[in-house]
Amino acid sequence: MIQGTTSDAGKSTLVAGLCRLARRAGARVAPFKPQNMALNSAVTADGGEIGRAQALQALAAGVAPHTDFNPVLLKPTSDRGAQVIIHGAARMNLDARAYHDYKPVAFDAVLESYARLRAGYDTVIVEGAGSPAEINLRDGDIANMGFAERVDCPVVLVADIDRGGVFAHLVGTLACLSDSERARVRGFVINRFRGDIGLLEPGLDWLRAQTGKPVFGVLPYLHGLLLDAEDMLPRQARSAATRDGAGVLRVVVPALPRISNHTDFDPLRAHPQVEFTYWKSGPVPAADLLILPGSKSVQRDLQWLRDAGWDTVIRRHLRYGGKVIGICGGMQMLGRTLDDPLGLEGAPGSVPGLGLFDFDTTLLPHKTLKNVTGQLALPGAPAVRGYEIHMGDTRGPALAAPALQLAADDAAGGSRADGALSADGQLLATYVHGLFDTPAACAALLAWAGLDGGERIDYPALREASIERLADSFAEHLDLRALYAEFR
């Protein structure tokens, strides 16, 4: 089991790389995260949803994503509450205290999934959540040491040296553990190191002497990896680096407080002719394309946009010929009204949308979870492959001019319409996530938004190359023989 001294220490990445190495060695390997808290999720082959990191790890392992890989997923709806997803299906919304009482039920689901994976795979690589040293969460823990102790799983502790204080993180984490938990930690991995490894050696010697545990490796900081991020938005804007005379497309996405599935925009951030910005505050920069992203709390995030003046920004942008895309929750915001009669995302009630499309959305308790294929309603009808994750039912005249035609859900074939494309061709709305992942669709959308002579990129291929690069680095910098010996 891989546990971390902090959130974002590198647990997910370490599991992904180890999954790829196990696959290279011919093992049938599965990733497993007992409990995940994330707003970025993926649709599985068995029709549920799991954390995005586990979907990436499944890709690294060469297996189809399955709900057993992440049996408990918590999707925050507010600072104190979350939607609880068990075995891929939304069960209820709970605040933190109520979820604490529910944990024994959630733990049963965790153990069921783990047992199935142990029976079906040669190797299961487990990822913890956050840090095992959260004293206030120790009672009833199902994500870190509580799970490891229950199933007798050895632990490797990973720490991010790029943050600073790596030795304090490692030794301090051990100090917060019980004797049995501390004994369960077999050793350490230090992540994101830059510089001369020789200058780090005295610290590593001290760590070994202080703890009596080995350091299995020091992993270098790998720049330019294109791997799905699960929680944190990228810290910096992405500036285009183009050839002389090549076009540049400016794309701005508001960093909504409850933004979901921001992995939709990874292909744009990777595109050499896209200047990409997540807007958080201050003046909205000039843009060719504005994209309203998905949201786990659409009404609240819409109010946040209004408070920031984005309703005026969008209308001015359209007056000057700019293009706008709304994805999932962003699509719902573009309509006339948002109705939440059951209070699924907050207090029951209805709020006006931005009024740019003639349709209305009602939030319903049933969540749509589908992997989809189809074609964009743009020149050349480019192919699209993506997924739907939403609780909204949208209806209205604007849907008569759909943005996509998707393959029908049943065996009868045919197609079904999705989203809307405005009569003036400036607005596009869709429920489909992953819109830019397919090379042809990405190229067509960027051309529609105004990019002349755009380069076509294959984001899935770039992501696969990043996984390979990650595994190569691990093979070079980890003592795999010593690491594997602890787990046999």
From Swiss-Prot:
Active site residues according to the UniProt entry: 328, 433
Disulfide-bonded cysteines: none
Keyword tRNA processing tagged: no
Any GO BP: cobalamin biosynthetic process
Any GO MF annotation of the entry: ABC-type vitamin B12 transporter activity
The GATase cobBQ-type domain, residue ranges: 248-441
Top-level taxonomic group: Bacteria
Keyword Signal: no
Pathways per UniProt: Cofactor biosynthesis; adenosylcobalamin biosynthesis
Entry keywords, A to Z: Cobalamin biosynthesis, Glutamine amidotransferase
PROSITE patterns registered for this protein in UniProt: GATASE_COBBQ
PANTHER family reported for this sequence: COBYRIC ACID SYNTHASE, DETHIOBIOTIN SYNTHETASE
Family: Belongs to the CobB/CobQ family. CobQ subfamily.
Its job: Catalyzes amidations at positions B, D, E, and G on adenosylcobyrinic A,C-diamide. NH(2) groups are provided by glutamine, and one molecule of ATP is hydrogenolyzed for each amidation.
NCBIfam families tied to this protein: cobQ, PRK00784.1
The name this protein goes by in its record: Cobyric acid synthase
This protein's encoding gene: cobQ
